[in-house]
Structure formats: C-alpha cells, structure tokens
Amino acid sequence: MKNWLKKYAALLLALIVISGVCFLFSSRKEGMFIDEIYTYGLSNSYYAPYVTDLKDGSLIDKVMTRQELVDYLTVGDNDRFAAGSVYYNQTRDVHPPMYYWLLNFVSSFFPGQFSMWPALVMNYIIYMLALVLLYKLVMLLFSSRLNAVMAVLLYGLSTIGLSTMLMIRMYVLLTLLTVLLAYLIARLMHEKKTVLYPLIGLTVFAGLMTQYYFVFYAFFVCLSYDIYALIKKDYRGFVMFSLAALCGAVCLLPAFPACLNQLFADALVS
C-alpha cells in the first residue's frame, strides 16, 4: 500500500487540486445554456422530447405551469430508468443516446427533483476517469511520471477541460472515449493482446453512440495505426484492428437506425 501511494502520490495530488477547482466552479454555476436544459428534457421527459409535445405540438396561446416544466425536466416516480423513452426521444433529436442514458440513470435516483448537481457529479466522475486515462496514455508514450502528471494538470485545469465538465452535455463523455481509444491503440503498439481488439471496437461504437463527430477522430487515429501496422509488416494485426474498428462503426446502424436520418437530413443539424 505504501509503495502504491508513493508511486501515485503526484497523480493523486494533481487530481485533488483539479477536484477542488471543479467543485469550486460547479458551486458557482448559475443558470444553464438552452442545450443543457434540453439535455435534461430529452433524458428525463417520458416519451416527450420537446416542451411542445406536452401541449399537443404547439405552445401558441397556451400556458405552461411550473409543474409541467418540472415534469419535463425530471424523472417521474413511475418512469425511472426508462431507457426506451430516452432512445425514443433521441430518435426525434439530432444526437445519439449514450450520454442521455447516463443522465437518465442518475436522475432516476432523484425522481421529481430538478438540480444541476447529479449531472455535475456524473460529469466530474467521467472527467476524473478521462484524466486517469490521460495519465496512463502519457506514461505509455513517454515513460515519465513527471510528463504524465503535467499533462493531467495542463488539461485538467485548462479552460476547455473544465468547460466540458461544467457543461451538462455529452462532450465530457466524448473526451473520455477519445482518450480511451488513444490509450487502447497505444497499448496495442506495446503489446499484441487479442483482448484489445474487441475493446477498441466497443470504444469506437460507444464514441459514435455519444457524438457523431467522434467518427472524424476515430477515422484518422485508426488510419494512423493501420499505416503503422503496415510499416511494421504486421499484416495480421492490420486485419484484426481494421475489422474491430469497422465493426464498432457499423454496429451504430442496427443499434440506432435513426442516425441515418439525423446525419443525412436536408436541414443542417449539429
């Protein structure tokens, strides 16, 4: 235990400092961007993705009560852990459902209660996991604890890093999966463990189920590894890696067919 603490003391200290900053800014968060409000509604409203769905498709000349708005933003006592509702809501939105499932899961422990804290704590946990993976990635690449801890501090205290944690959107989860894919590929470069291939495929799938823009990052980082494998004449590794990554991407289609309409809609979506 003492050896473990000594080995990771600098990382733990860095995470404690970052945690303090995270909770400081979280406690000072005032109000939410409209997309954050929709994140709650899409996650927690029972088969009613938009506010207008509560009023027969239109709010013109209609009044919404406070309770109706609370019902839209929170999980009800009788519809907790409603993954099917989240899935349906996202087929009517422009994003895949992964992050919304997580928020619905967390919100289901607090039915009828609206607060930013459950989502912020969830984001904080995801953020810490991303930073630990970043540490492990830099250790693999540079074999230097100093470099790894500095990378954690530089990103963990950066404006962009903290913004992903503070904003109740899918971007912090996207960051985690981005670092995870890089880490798994770096592991594969150091050790040819067969178990890494399905993990890479699952990560690609999870990334695409979180945010469609993940495809651009995944394409180029996977292409880079394919080139590396060909240069090393590791043809077996090239085939297995390519199949794993491709399977992860293709699995998006049967898992969330609505992605086709969302990606190729006539109207510009994000």
Write out the residue ranges for each language-model feature:
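Start-transfer (signal-anchor) and selected internal transmembrane alpha helices
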Residues: M1-F23, S27
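Specific aromatic-rich, kink-prone transmembrane helix
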Residues: F105, L133-K136, L153, L157, ...
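Short acidic/glycine- and proline-prone juxtamembrane loop motifs at membrane-interface regions
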Residues: L166-Y171
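Perimembrane helix-loop-helix junctions
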Residues: A182-L199, V204, F216-V250, N261-F264, ...
